[in-house]
């Protein structure tokens, strides 16, 4: 069960990376647009942060001009 949870959280990072790259935004630029540290963005995308808060996801979604649902869907 934990493996499934980890896979879904890794999916969030992969979705963020995909959306960010589709928009041509660097990790550094996304961190500034979302008012988050670069380290936070890097950790989420790489799977190092397996528990991003809804506040963090909302900031990222707003910066990418997408819905939070777009970050968490498979």
Model-found features: residue ranges?
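A detector for short, charged/polar N-terminal pre-domain segments
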Residues: 1-11
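Short amphipathic helical patch at the helix-1/turn junction of helix-turn-helix
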Residues: 10, 21-22, 51
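Short basic helix-loop element that most often maps to the first helix and adjoining turn
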Residues: 14-33, 59
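Conserved hydrophobic/aromatic packing and binding residues within compact polymer-binding modules
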Residues: 16, 30-31, 41-44, 71
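Recognition helix of helix-turn-helix/homeodomain-like DNA-binding domains
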Residues: 36-51
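DNA major-groove recognition helix of helix-turn-helix/homeodomain DNA-binding modules
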Residues: 55-70
């Amino acid at each position: 069960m934990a493996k499934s949870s980890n896979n879904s959280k890794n999916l969030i990072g992969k979705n963020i990376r995909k959306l960010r790259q589709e928009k041509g935004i660097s990790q550094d630029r996304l961190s500034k647009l979302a008012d988050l540290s670069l380290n936070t963005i890097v950790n989420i995308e790489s799977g190092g942060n397996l528990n991003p808060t809804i506040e963090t996801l909302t900031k990222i979604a707003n910066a990418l001009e997408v819905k939070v649902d777009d970050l968490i869907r498979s």
